[in-house]
Amino acid sequence: MNATDMDTEAAFRNDHETIAGEDPFAMFGEWLELAHRKEINDANAMALATADPDGLPNVRMVLLKGFDREGFVFYTNTESQKGVELAENMQAAAVLHWKSLRRQVRFRGTVNRVSAEEADAYFVSRARASRIGAWASKQSRPLENRTALAKSVATEAARFGISDIPRPAFWTGFRIVPNCIEFWMDKPFRLHDRLVFKRSHSGEPWSALKLYP
């Protein structure tokens, strides 16, 4: 079922629907489109999990900024905690949970940097203040106070003036290339519907199976 064909209350009738499909990326696109219509804020927000060198996981919310048949893309400062952890361990997992839909999608796999051209194209699409912020913020490092951050922003704004703001070398995008994608739909009495797609490597066909809730 295409999300655009669903009436405004369809998301709340999970009780009578089941998850079905053969193409996880197409299914994700339909669910995300519906979420953009129903969620109050940031339907593309996802919890991203990485791990430090000791294997201790860290998780934080980031924004999914794109997806295609290769994977799911987000952007960050490479000197941030997640950037440093990804440099050591290029694997990650993420989940998007939509309370208004009573649905979620989670995926995991290897992580690759996007091309410089792709990162540049996205960076230039950001608001000018956000581009300045990318230069001003020493992400994940100690901050004395908000005044110090404001001064850093002012310094970078003065440095660039009205000129173009290039993408910092320490700021780029990452693509999670999934080997597992699971769709979850809430059902009464915790008898939820789960459909998982798996593959060994990118480009291989997906196998799909239902899971007990």
Swiss-Prot record:
NCBIfam families: pdxH, PRK05679.1. One of its GO terms (biological process) is pyridoxine biosynthetic process. Homodimer. Its cofactor is FMN. It comes from the Bacteria. Pathway: Cofactor metabolism; pyridoxal 5'-phosphate salvage; pyridoxal 5'-phosphate from pyridoxamine 5'-phosphate: step 1/1; Cofactor metabolism; pyridoxal 5'-phosphate salvage; pyridoxal 5'-phosphate from pyridoxine 5'-phosphate: step 1/1. Coiled coil: none annotated. The lineage of its organism: Bacteria, Pseudomonadati, Pseudomonadota, Betaproteobacteria, Burkholderiales. It is an enzyme of class 1 (oxidoreductase). It catalyses: pyridoxamine 5'-phosphate + O2 + H2O = pyridoxal 5'-phosphate + H2O2 + NH4(+); pyridoxine 5'-phosphate + O2 = pyridoxal 5'-phosphate + H2O2. Catalyzes the oxidation of either pyridoxine 5'-phosphate (PNP) or pyridoxamine 5'-phosphate (PMP) into pyridoxal 5'-phosphate (PLP). GO terms for molecular function: FMN binding; pyridoxamine phosphate oxidase activity. PROSITE patterns: PYRIDOX_OXIDASE. Pfam families: PNP_phzG_C, PNPOx_N. FMN binds at residues 60-65, 75-76, 82, 104, 139-140, 184, 194. Substrate binds at residues 65, 122, 126, 130, 190-192. This is Pyridoxine/pyridoxamine 5'-phosphate oxidase 2. Belongs to the pyridoxamine 5'-phosphate oxidase family. InterPro entries: Pyridox_Oxase, Pyridox_Oxase_CS, Pyridox_Oxase_N, Pyridoxamine_oxidase_dimer_C, Split_barrel_FMN-bd. Keywords: Flavoprotein, FMN, Oxidoreductase, Plasmid, Pyridoxine biosynthesis.
